[in-house]
Amino acid sequence: MPGKLRPDDLLLHGSNIFVIAQDNNNNPDGTAVAGTSPQSEVIEYDLNGNIVGTFKVPGHPDGLLEYDSHTVWVSTNEDANPMLIVIDTTANTQQTLTPDTTPIHSGGLDDMKMLDGVVYAAASNPTVGAATATAPNGVSSVPSVYTVTLNSDHQTFHLTPALMGNATATNIPTNTQVTLNMTDPDSMAIDPSGKLVVDSQQDSELVFVTNPGANQSVSVLPLTLYGNSWPVDDTRWAPSGNSFMLLSDNTAQMIYRIDATAGFTAGTAYSAGQGTLLTVNTSTGAMTPVFTGMNTPHGLIFVGD
């Protein structure tokens, strides 16, 4: 990465790769470290690693979304004071938007995904109630996911709660009903069956939402490594056909290309977490390391050969 910028989220847009490049002097709430003038970027690369374009973005960017064939959305400031940057990748122009009211969860926005034409965003850094013996990370009663719509004033966006942090869900391994306690909504994904997947990072769980909306159903997969709860960042499912993986290592300022000698098995889930790339058994939540020795892996995508 150029200079001291650190890669985070990755996006395949057309035939190029867009990369969040964070200036570490941008705090996650959008403020700057005292005495610094940080400038984070979104960098566009071709598949040979050449820089094609650079977009300077305000605050601490974290999420990327392909809205359509010529538009990329960027979420910035995952702890507080969230903004959206809408980039026209054909005209190479961009616009910054702010929420039309303070988000209910009092935090920022992290990852985004589009499903059936609706944009969903993770409600990161929520204000939670006091910790208890059974809820050491606090107790959530605020939204964990919003839908995002742009307002006609071209300056603001609107957030509508789509999933509460204390929603009722089915625990996948035990097939029992539980009450969620999502204290750290972070990365998002779409699984092969079309479910919206939300990573509640410090809670070490993936939450699956079937048919998001009024008639949605929710299930939760606690994640473990060698029997211990294990937090992850991005999770992706290997596609059919030939592909390779790109994985960003934030503090190492690296993006790895990972190829499987015999090819990736379609439908297998992979997660980046705690210096390791892991496969995920989506029936039990048990994970298996497949690539180790990284610093802080964050963004993960598959790219078709």
What does each model-identified segment do?
Residues 87-93, 147-159, 209-216, 259-263, ...:
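Short loop/turn segments immediately following beta-strands, especially the blade-tip
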Residues 1, 50-56, 93-103, 158-179, ...:
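A short beta-strand motif characteristic of beta-propeller blades
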Residues 22-25, 76-79, 123-127, 140, ...:
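Short loop/turn segments immediately following the C-termini of beta-strands
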Residues 60-63, 75-113:
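Asp-box/WD-like beta-propeller blade repeats and closely related beta-sheet repeat scaffolds
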